[in-house]
Structures are given as C-alpha cells and as structure tokens.
C-alpha cells in the first residue's frame, strides 16, 4: 500500500513514472480502494519546503485545469470519482498556488482518458479476473516507461517481467523511485534515455567472462569424466 500511495501522489503526480493506473483483482478491489483512499487522505499536503510535507502543489494553473478536465472526462466515461475532486484547503491560504487532494477514480474500462498522461495525482482503478487480462490492460496504452506487479507467485512475476511492454518493470516495488542506476528508458511513445543509465557504460568496456571454482573438484560440462 505504501508503494501505491507514494507512486500515485509523490511529486503531486507529476513524475514520468507516476502510478496512473492501479489494476486490481476484482475479488479484492473494494478493500484495496478503501485502503488507498484512507491512506491518501492522511498524506501531509502543503509547502514542499516545510519538513514533513509529502505532497506539494501542481506546477501551475494549466496543470490544475488539465486535472479537472481529466476527472470530467472520466465521469463522462462512466467513472466514479471516489475522492480528491477538489482543491486542498491549503490552497485557501495560498490562492495563487494549486494544491489539490489526490483523486481516486474507479473506471469501468480503460477509456482514452485513462490512457492519457495528465501529470496530476489521479489514480484510475481498473479490475481484472485473470493475469492475462491484467497484462493486456497494462500494455494497451501508448506509453511504456514504468510498470510494477505485486505478487507472491514467482511464476506470475516472471510472466509479467517477460510480457510487460515497458522499459522498466518492477516486482513488489512501485513504479516510481526504484529506477536510479539502471537503464532508464521506455517503449512505444515514451522517450528513450537508456544511454544515460549505468548500463550504457558497458558499450565502452571490454568484457571478460570469469569462472571461479572454490571446490577441490574439477567440474566439467556435459557430465564428462576426466581422470
């Protein structure tokens, strides 16, 4: 839950790796949504220069209007805005700033607005019945930067890593904040950037394969016996 909340609301939803879609198994969707809403309501929202603040304002009025428009589109598509459809009370003290409450929206399907990057703290909740459906939903958007799965099933994790159409695919950690040091880049309409990651160094390095045997025996391939 902490990973979901951080990825959805961190930097007020204005990261390229922000969690925009939460794809939850239908059997636990109600419980998960209730916990997410409860956690988001407790987030300290305010001046980002003050210690303890976790969510600051949107960057400008245009970003706020984009968020309002996205929520209106979600409603028109049959979505239920459960929480967050308002400016935060902190905005009363700072009327020229755009502090907002993170929004949670349950959607009946993955509509065009769900597949659009708004760069605002909007979390669209979709449900699935089979892992195949969840992976298909994950991939059926124009972007392909960061994705994550939470599971205790190693086979599910391996399938997701193999089939996620994203440059970053995580297991049991959120979409945002775990990518430093690796090759950072995406697929489809998402920009590149892998040349800025540490993996790019390998293009300038010589490679050496090393096998170190710490046993007292001589291991041989293909079951060969020698002396």
Regions found by a protein language model. Give the residues of each.
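Conserved C-terminal structural/oligomerization subdomain of aldehyde/semialdehyde dehydrogenase
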Residues: 44, 92-95, 99-227
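ALDH superfamily catalytic-core signature
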Residues: 1-109, 171, 219-220, 226-227
């Amino acid at each position: 839950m902490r990973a979901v909340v951080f990825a959805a609301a961190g930097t007020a939803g204005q990261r390229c790796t922000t969690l925009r879609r939460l794809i939850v198994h239908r059997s636990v969707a109600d419980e998960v949504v209730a916990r997410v809403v409860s956690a988001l309501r407790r987030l300290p929202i305010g001046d980002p220069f003050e210690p303890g603040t976790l969510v600051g304002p949107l960057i400008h009025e245009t970003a706020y209007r984009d968020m309002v428009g996205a929520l209106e589109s979600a409603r028109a598509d049959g979505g239920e805005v459960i929480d967050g459809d308002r400016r935060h009370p902190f905005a009363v003290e700072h009327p020229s700033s755009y502090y907002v409450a993170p929004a949670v929206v349950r959607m009946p399907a993955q509509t065009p607005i769900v597949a659009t990057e708004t760069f605002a703290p909007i979390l669209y909740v979709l449900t699935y019945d089979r892992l195949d459906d969840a992976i298909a939903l994950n991939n059926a958007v124009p972007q392909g930067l960061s994705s994550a799965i939470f599971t205790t099933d190693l086979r599910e994790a391996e399938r997701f890593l193999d089939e996620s159409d994203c440059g970053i695919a995580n297991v049991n950690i959120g979409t945002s904040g775990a990518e430093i040091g690796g090759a950072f880049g995406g697929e489809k309409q998402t920009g590149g950037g892998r040349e800025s990651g540490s993996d790019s160094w390998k293009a300038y390095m010589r490679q050496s394969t090393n096998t170190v045997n710490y046993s007292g025996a001589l291991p041989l391939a293909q079951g060969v016996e020698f002396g």
